[in-house]
Regions:
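N-terminal Rossmann-like NAD(P) cofactor-binding subdomain of oxidoreductases
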Residues: 1-192, 227-229, 257, 262, ...
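Glycine-rich beta-alpha junction loops
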Residues: 39-41, 129-130, 154-161, 196-204, ...
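Short, solvent-exposed beta-strand edge segments and adjacent coil->beta transition regions
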Residues: 120-121, 242-246, 312-316
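Oxyanion-binding "anion nests"
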Residues: 193-240
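A short beta-alpha structural unit
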Residues: 233-250, 284-289
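Glycine-rich phosphate/pyrophosphate-binding beta-alpha loops
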Residues: 235-238, 321-326
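Hydrophobic alpha-helical bundle architecture
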Residues: 251-252, 256, 318-320
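A common structural junction motif
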Residues: 259, 264-274
Length: 341
């Protein structure tokens, strides 16, 4: 088997660190690993497969010799540096928003549109975490009945804002437990502990936030459904890890609840956890505490959409997934695996 020189831009962040773990867990054929981060992190070491890897400063010239570069940096750094990686001969798989809606850049979820990697021109984009978590179970149902509309509410963990988000929530919880003054929020617009924040991203179209519009815009591109209609509300919740979503789908063809369950029970990347009707049911359904640090999207609470005038064409379900793994790092490594297949 061939092996590849792999670089990670943003190697010290939450997603970059998870990419390292995923490369190792999936036994990706790495010949030489290069880690790029800010000048502040340069010179530090990270362990990979029992060896110490020195972090290099990320510069336009740093990518020479890389075959694949995984991007885990913010939009501005991605726009500034990753085109230089392509010029140096690497194929880039980027987790930022910078290139997602570029017409020349495939936006890929391997379980859905893995073949799109074939038309890449040097950059492949990783979708937004909430998009991935919602679409992995939606896609197999679409293949059976044809999705026309999605109504989605997301419940997004603090770690969706990276390490600072997690640290801020932990500090607030600790202060509450000790009866101390609440630390001033900085990662979020308001206190998150014992609270919900119904805004993620800036306001864009018709009062929807940038995060809410991503699911429609990215979903249309990934599923090749330019007319897909999505109504999404995104909420930040006081959970450390794993996003949850309530999704109602409207179909163009009839689908029974039993059919939908059968489809999801065998769908790639999905785990059906919906034991309400089982003889030994314990009312166990997907929860973020169970889906953290693993790669499957758990689906449950499946039921008909009784608000639909044709109840045979509406399904509602609840899903949870680790947004750092499948919602970011794992999805990127899966794309890399498609490239070297």
């Amino acid at each position: 088997m061939s092996s590849y020189n792999v670089g990670i831009l943003g190697a010290t962040g939450a997603v970059g660190q998870q990419m390292l773990e995923c490369l190792q867990e999936r036994d990706f054929p790495v010949a030489d690993l290069r880690l790029f981060a800010s000048a502040r992190s340069a010179g530090k070491t990270v362990e990979f497969k029992g060896e110490k890897v020195v972090i290099e400063e990320a510069t336009p010239q740093c990518f020479k010799g890389c075959d694949i570069v995984l991007g885990a940096a913010g939009d501005d750094i991605a726009k500034e540096l990753l085109p230089h990686a392509v010029e140096a001969g690497a194929t880039v798989i980027d987790n930022s928003h910078a290139f997602r809606m570029d017409g020349d850049v495939p936006l890929v979820v391997p379980e859905i549109n893995g073949d799109d990697v074939k038309w890449n021109k040097g950059i492949i984009a990783n979708p937004n975490c909430a998009t991935i978590i919602g679409l992995v179970p939606t896609w197999p149902l679409h293949q059976v009945a044809g999705v026309q509309r999605m109504i989605v509410s997301t419940y997004q963990a603090a770690s969706g804002a990276g390490v600072p988000g997690m640290r801020e929530l932990e500090a607030q919880i600790a202060a509450m437990g000790k009866g101390e003054p609440m630390p001033e929020p900085s990662a979020f617009a308001a206190q998150l502990a014992s609270n919900l924040i119904p805004q993620i991203g800036g306001f864009k179209y018709e009062g929807f936030t940038s995060e809410e519009m991503k699911l429609q815009n990215e979903g249309r591109k990934i599923m090749h459904l330019p007319e897909l209609r999505v109504n999404c509300t995104c909420v930040r919740v006081p959970v450390l890890r794993s996003h949850s979503e309530s999704i109602t789908l409207e179909f163009e063809r009839d689908i029974t609840l039993e059919q939908a369950r059968e489809v999801l029970a065998s769908a790639p990347g999905v785990k059906l956890v919906d034991d309400r009707d089982a003889a030994d049911a314990h009312d166990r359904f997907p929860m973020p505490i169970d889906t953290s640090d693993q790669d499957l999207i758990w689906v449950g609470r499946m039921r008909r959409d009784i608000s639909n005038s044709n109840v045979s064409r509406g399904i509602t379900f609840w899903c949870c997934g680790d947004q750092i793994r499948k919602g970011a790092a794992t999805n990127a490594v899966q794309i890399a695996q498609l490239l070297v297949k």
